[in-house]
Amino acid sequence: MNGGRIGGNGMGVKHGREYEQILNDLTEAVGRIPDSYEFFEMEAEDWDRLDPAGRQEVNEALAEDLFYALGTEPVIAVGSGVVIYEPEQHRIYVLIGDEELTSVPLI
């Protein structure tokens, strides 16, 4: 679905890239936040017990939730990171700790 807002009730960020590409990039970015699991109120022990496929599944769910939530809430804390939607720049920024920053292009 190109060039529109996705989500049943108009939520989600405006984008021009394929949703799957954005979701893949956002999944990778949030996966770099070491305690991203805290977003789902998971304990470190539960996260440590997950195999890589399980962790990927959690990060994909997180990326999808963030994509829709950022349409109404442009700054969201995720563990020790922060995810920021900048509509004028057509990007989602992921701040990891105090210094590392990555971004996901939306167009």
PLM features: what roles do these ranges have?
Residues N2-I107:
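Alpha-helical propensity feature that highlights long, continuous alpha-helices across diverse contexts
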